[in-house]
């Protein structure tokens, strides 16, 4: 047994206002995250619009486990482990594909129905029925512990026993509701492909940064700050480019971010942008308001579009931006390596200019060739390098800490409070140890 393979040792890594560097830099801790954390939590798999037809598949990973979702014959979306029960071959290639009426292994042509059940085995007369029926392979493809489709967002929990979907997410699902409701038809579709790039840092650094509101005006001074300075020199009457609208809020002063507010929920979820947001001052899109009023009525349309949450963290590893219809998935590959996927969505029934803004935002902020995102990348990688130092063991999360705050399951507070980071790490302890005999209720 390793030094951290017990609940007490893991819990000792997280204090009220500090986190031990091993949470970000120790390979054993990372392996335990793959075994426990990503198995005990509800993790994002994909979006139902990626598998629109029966037999469509989308292959990805949850933690270190290869999985795929597939549209079954009854129209439901199933999530299965991406492993043939015969010789262990990965069945579905990464990304979107179409399997047809059944899934066929490329090695020995064993075939499976789209619910994972075994359909056919070549030369089956070579297997004794009683003997074969007692093997694991006879059960077909292994499903994940549980899967749930919510407003077309597909999540799964790998472990067969654990916290329920509604209990895990609670009121945090209101962010997904708001993003979907921004469509006059109440539907989203994945659009514009996916942008991926590698980060040589621990995955939790990216999650932490989503609600770190004390860094934008510093880290993004050379990128967003330059864009603002150039715009300020433009001749009077020059139409304001969409790119400037997207860049400018990143260099707002501390007072703006303090007033923006932050909300946390139980189990590690939370968001910035309660009373104001980086996305609150975009130019109106012609025709959009009228289509929303026609769909929802004026009062409801005001409520939907007036909720401009900035970054919503869904623990453990996604961030959603409802007002610009983007989702970032932080896929852990190693203790010091993370693949970031940036996804964009179309508001079905809304003007195309909204999708244009979404795609531009993703390119400017979240792409491998982005401007703002590379400021963050540089800092993440410097942080990972700095953690090699043994001069200090603890990272500080003490900003605006209040004794006893962990007793509150929902809180709204100053936008520069590090409460959400502390909230995440308390959830980290809980779900890292949930399936251990001496599990810790953090």
Segment roles from a protein language model:
Residues 1-9, 438-442:
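Basic/polar N-terminal segments that are highly enriched at the extreme N-terminus
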Residues 6-23:
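Short, contiguous pre-domain boundary segments
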Residues 23-63:
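Glycine/alanine-rich phosphate-binding loops at beta-alpha junctions
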Residues 38-42, 89, 215:
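Generic structural signal for secondary-structure transition and capping sites
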Residues 39-52, 126-131, 308-314:
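Short Pro/Gly-enriched beta-strand edge/turn motifs at strand-loop
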Residues 50-174:
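Rieske [2Fe-2S] iron-sulfur-binding domain
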């Amino acid at each position: 047994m390793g030094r951290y393979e017990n609940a007490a040792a893991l819990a000792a890594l997280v204090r009220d206002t500090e986190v031990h560097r091993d949470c970000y830099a120790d390979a054993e801790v990372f392996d335990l995250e793959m075994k426990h954390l990503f198995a005990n939590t509800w993790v994002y798999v994909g979006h139902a619009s990626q598998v629109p037809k029966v037999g469509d598949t989308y292959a990805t990973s949850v933690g270190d486990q290869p999985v795929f979702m597939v549209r079954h014959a009854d129209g439901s979306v199933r999530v299965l482990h991406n492993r043939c029960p015969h010789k262990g071959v990965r069945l579905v290639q990464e990304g979107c594909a179409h399997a047809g009426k059944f899934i066929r292994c490329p090695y020995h042509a064993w075939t499976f129905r789209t619910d994972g059940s075994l359909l056919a085995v070549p030369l089956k007369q070579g297997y004794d029925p009683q003997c074969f029926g007692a093997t694991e392979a006879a059960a077909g493809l292994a499903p994940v512990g549980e899967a749930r489709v919510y407003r077309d967002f597909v999540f799964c929990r790998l472990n067969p026993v654990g916290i329920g979907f509604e209990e895990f997410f609670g009121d945090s699902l209101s962010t997904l509701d708001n993003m979907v409701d921004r469509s006059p038809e109440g539907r989203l579709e994945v659009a514009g492909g996916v942008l991926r790039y590698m980060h040589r840092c621990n995955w939790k650094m990216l999650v932490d940064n989503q609600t770190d509101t004390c860094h934008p005006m510093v880290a993004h001074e050379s990128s967003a700050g330059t864009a603002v300075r150039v715009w300020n020199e433009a001749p009077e009457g020059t139409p304001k480019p969409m790119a400037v609208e997207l860049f400018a809020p990143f260099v707002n002063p501390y007072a703006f971010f303090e007033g923006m507010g932050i909300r946390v929920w139980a189990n590690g979820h939370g968001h910035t942008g309660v009373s104001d947001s980086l996305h609150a001052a975009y130019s109106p899109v012609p025709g959009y308001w009228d289509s929303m009023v026609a769909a929802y009525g004026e009062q409801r349309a005001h409520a939907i579009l007036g909720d401009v949450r900035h970054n919503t963290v869904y623990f453990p590893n996604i961030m959603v931006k409802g007002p610009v219809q983007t989702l970032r998935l932080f896929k852990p590959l190693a203790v010091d390596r993370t693949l970031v996927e940036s996804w964009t969505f179309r508001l079905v029934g809304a003007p195309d200019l909204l999708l244009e803004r979404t795609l531009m935002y993703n390119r400017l902020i979240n792409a491998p060739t982005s401007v703002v995102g590379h400021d963050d990348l540089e800092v993440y990688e410097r942080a990972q390098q700095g953690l090699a130092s043994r001069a200090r063991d603890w990272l500080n999360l003490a900003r605006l800490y209040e004794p006893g705050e962990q007793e509150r399951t929902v809180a709204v507070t100053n936008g520069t409070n590090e409460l959400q980071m502390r909230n995440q790490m308390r959830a980290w302890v809980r779900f890292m140890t949930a399936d251990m005999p001496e599990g810790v209720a953090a």
